[in-house]
A protein has these predicted regions:
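Small/flexible residues
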Residues: 4-5, 50
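Bacterial N-terminal signal peptides
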Residues: 5-15
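Compact, glycine-rich, soluble single-domain proteins
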Residues: 20-144
Length: 144
């Protein structure tokens, strides 16, 4: 009986641990003024596709950094995104090449698509207002 209880206990723990989503990778990202944000890293196709969808809140010291394998015309939409965002595109040197300020959630299809006309390798999403408040500008470099 003890052995059966132990096996059931072990299997229950294994099922709980196995079924949990891994915590997102967090990375400090430093803005040109020295302020540091903690950003979730979206490095895989799956995490990039999900992005910040279905989030109901995002604090000003948090964000999501999308990292792509290759530079390209990486465009974003706000489908299923519930909070307004600022989006910051960067090239392979982490230099800002384009900013979209105060992008609203998409309420009706088709959703607008946002992005630069030049290739980017990284995109930072933060809660709406952060890019203006931190005076982010094209040509500045972010550190991460």
């Amino acid at each position: 009986m003890k052995r059966v209880s132990f096996v059931i206990f072990f299997m229950t723990i294994a099922a709980v641990v196995y079924g949990q989503e891994p915590a997102p990778a967090m990375l400090p990202l430093t803005l040109p003024d020295g302020k540091t944000l903690q950003v979730e890293v979206a490095r895989t196709e799956e995490t990039r596709a999900l992005g910040l969808m279905f989030r109901t809140a995002l604090t000003e010291d948090r964000g999501m950094l999308f990292i792509f394998e290759q530079p390209g015309l990486h465009r974003f939409w706000m489908k299923n995104t519930l909070i307004p965002l600022d989006m910051v595109w960067m090239d392979d040197r982490k230099r800002i090449i384009h900013i979209e300020y105060q992008v609203p959630p998409c309420k009706l299809d088709p959703c607008a698509v946002y992005g630069p006309s030049a290739d980017s390798l990284y995109v930072l999403e933060v809660i709406s207002g952060v890019a203006s408040r931190e005076q982010l500008r094209v040509g500045q470099t972010l550190t991460f």
